[in-house]
């Protein structure tokens, strides 16, 4: 398996990641997220879904942080008692918020594609709804580590 194939396979099988953002005071904020990778656009989408939240989507800490500082990291990892099967993938990149009331046509198509990818990977979204906002990550650096012995 080539490195590129290994990377795509591992990313696509990962069910959860951890999104790291930073506020203006350089205080980190890390949360668990679901995500999809869009092969056509070489970017990641993270929904701001309709599960219960403490505040409106536009007021969430992750959203405000990305609006103030677009530098983000998405960490995907696997823990196994057999340490030869451990891995992590860290994607560093620029985050942006898609969605809201005033959408351009190309943004609408992008949201529709992301929603389809997310519903395909996570069928739970057919019941709870994905929401009107997404985080888009354009990767700048990908760090891969595994211990496959």
Where are these regions (language model features)?
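Short Pro/Gly-enriched beta-strand edge/turn motifs at strand-loop
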Residues: 1, 13-19, 117-119
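Charged, gly/pro-rich active-site loop segments
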Residues: 2, 57, 79, 83-149
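Soluble sensory domains of the PAS superfamily and closely related sensory modules
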Residues: 9-12, 66
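A short, well-structured catalytic beta-strand-centered motif of the EAL phosphodiesterase domain
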Residues: 33-37
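General beta-strand recognition
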Residues: 18, 43-45, 73, 136, ...
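A short, Trp-centered hydrophobic/proline-enriched beta-strand micro-motif
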Residues: 11-23, 72-76
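A short mixed-secondary-structure module that forms the rim of ligand-binding clefts
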Residues: 39-79
């Amino acid at each position: 398996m080539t490195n590129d194939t290994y990377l795509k396979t591992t990313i696509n099988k990962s069910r959860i990641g951890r999104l790291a953002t930073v506020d203006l005071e350089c205080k980190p904020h890390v949360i668990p997220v679901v995500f999809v990778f869009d092969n056509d656009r070489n970017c990641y989408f993270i929904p701001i879904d309709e599960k219960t939240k403490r505040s409106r989507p536009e007021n969430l800490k992750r959203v405000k942080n990305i609006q103030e500082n677009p530098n983000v990291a998405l960490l995907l990892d696997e823990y196994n008692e057999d340490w030869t099967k451990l891995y992590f993938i860290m994607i560093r990149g620029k985050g942006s918020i898609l969605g809201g009331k005033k959408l351009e046509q190309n943004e609408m198509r992008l949201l529709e594609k992301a929603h389809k990818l997310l519903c395909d990977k996570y069928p739970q979204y057919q019941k709870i709804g994905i929401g009107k906002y997404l985080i888009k990550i354009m990767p700048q650096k990908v760090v891969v580590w595994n211990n496959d012995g």
